[in-house]
């Protein structure tokens, strides 16, 4: 008599019903594997796993340590930056903090610059001291102060600065800084978010590492959170090891959206460079504008540095209105095309008053201590027609007159 298979929970049948091996595909876009972990072959699993652990077999193990989509994004950014390796993480802030934790030892010392993203400053000034790490803060152009810091603290392991900086778009002399830091074996890390790899090749200029909030220009559509750190293989490996401990993993879909954004990076940045420069020039001539901060203008304190090491000056223009807090707010409220939002680098133009959107909780004294003026406006130029953007900004300046 033929035996009838015993009906159970179907676990064995479920295992046997695994999907077939992937077909060779000629798809134009990357296929995203949504996995938290990766299984190995059903034959010689342990031997293959040992080979993977010893670096003799290329594969993926666990989602926090990497996945094919993220690795593809890392490779593209690596090539764009002319770097040896690249790590993509969950945000630009995650990339910065993971780097600092990985490369600055307990009791160590770091040098940074005055004008920078608020949360980076907060991490350096309030979190690192808990591990005995001290910091010297210098003006972006003050090479003498950097040299003095390196002499007084030869244990300085890292110089870290944005270039251009946020929000005043100061530029540091990367080759000169790299030469000074080489004397003491100090690593140089440059946050090149405002520049992009198209406008500035920080690694070629002497930086050991270059960081990006990939949320901004690299992804470019105001719909992704991601960070990237590229550079020499050794420091990137150290950051990757720390990243694997801390987490901060970007998910495969976000990595895919980042890859999508990279496809149009050249088109977007070329337009934004030209439009921002034109808007900066017109703002400088406008009677209601007291000062314009844009490295493409000869009036900018670091224009000579920017002209030497950048091929374009980026899509962000900061400017000061001849008005008080509420008069400046009236300009921001009167624009029609940009969104009022705290980001930059996307296809849509964005505008903000840093006093209100980023530093309101600091109070007047706190804002003054870090150089944030009530009259300051930061404008991130998108891909809209420059004449439309200017007409809108001009009418906002006129309408808001007291």
What are the functions of these language-model segments?
Residues 1-60, 402:
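N-terminal glycine-rich, Lys/His-bearing helix-loop that initiates the first secondary-structure elements
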Residues 22-28, 39-40, 68, 230, ...:
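Positively charged, small/polar-rich N-terminal and surface patches that mediate targeting and assembly
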Residues 42-94, 119-127:
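Conserved N-terminal alpha-helix of the aminotransferase class I/II PLP-enzyme fold
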Residues 84, 125-126, 134, 148-152, ...:
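PLP-dependent enzyme catalytic core of the Aspartate aminotransferase-like
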Residues 86-288, 293:
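Conserved PLP-enzyme active-site core in the AAT-like
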Residues 247, 335-345, 396-402:
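A common structural junction motif
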Residues 289-377, 381:
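Conserved C-terminal alpha-helix-loop-beta "cap" of PLP-dependent enzymes
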């Amino acid at each position: 008599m033929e035996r009838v298979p015993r009906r159970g929970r179907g676990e064995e049948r479920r295992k046997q019903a695994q999907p077939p091996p992937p077909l060779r595909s000629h798809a134009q876009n990357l296929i995203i594997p949504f996995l938290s972990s990766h299984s190995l072959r059903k034959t010689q699993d342990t031997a293959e796993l040992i080979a993977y652990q010893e670096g003799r077999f290329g594969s993926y193990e666990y989602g926090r340590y990497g996945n094919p989509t993220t690795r593809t994004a890392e490779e593209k950014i690596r090539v764009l930056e002319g770097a040896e390796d690249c790590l993509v993480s969950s945000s630009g802030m995650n990339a910065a903090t993971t780097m600092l934790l990985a490369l600055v030892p307990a009791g160590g010392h770091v040098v940074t610059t005055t004008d920078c993203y608020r949360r980076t400053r907060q991490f350096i000034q309030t979190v690192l001291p808990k591990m005995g790490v001290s910091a010297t803060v210098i003006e972006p152009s003050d090479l003498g102060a950097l040299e003095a810091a390196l002499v007084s603290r030869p244990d300085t392991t890292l110089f870290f600065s944005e270039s251009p900086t946020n929000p005043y778009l100061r530029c540091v002399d990367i080759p000169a800084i790299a030469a000074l830091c080489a004397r003491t074996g100090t690593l140089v890390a440059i946050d090149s978010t405002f520049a992009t790899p198209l406008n500035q090749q920080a690694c070629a200029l002497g930086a050991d590492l270059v960081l990006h909030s990939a949320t901004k220009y690299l992804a470019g559509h105001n719909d992704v959170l991601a960070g990237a750190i590229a550079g020499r293989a050794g420091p990137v490996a150290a950051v990757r090891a720390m990243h694997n401990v801390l987490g901060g993993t970007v998910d495969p879909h976000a990595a895919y959206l980042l890859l999508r954004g990279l496809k149009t990076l050249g088109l977007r940045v070329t337009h934004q460079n030209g439009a921002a420069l034109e808007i900066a020039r017109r703002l400088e001539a406008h009677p209601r504008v007291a000062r314009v901060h844009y490295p493409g203008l000869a009036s900018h304190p670091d224009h000579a540095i920017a002209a030497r090491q950048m091929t374009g000056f980026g899509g962000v223009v900061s400017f000061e209105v001849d008005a008080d807090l509420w008069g400046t707010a009236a300009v921001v409220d009167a624009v029609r095309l940009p969104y009022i939002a705290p980001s930059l680098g996307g296809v849509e133009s964005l505008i903000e008053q840093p006093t209100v959107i980023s530093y309101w909780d600091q109070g007047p004294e706190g804002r003054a201590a870090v150089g944030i003026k009530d009259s300051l406006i930061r404008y991130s130029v998108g891909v809209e027609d420059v004449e439309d953007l200017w007409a809108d900004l001009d009418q906002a300046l006129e309408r808001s007159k007291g």
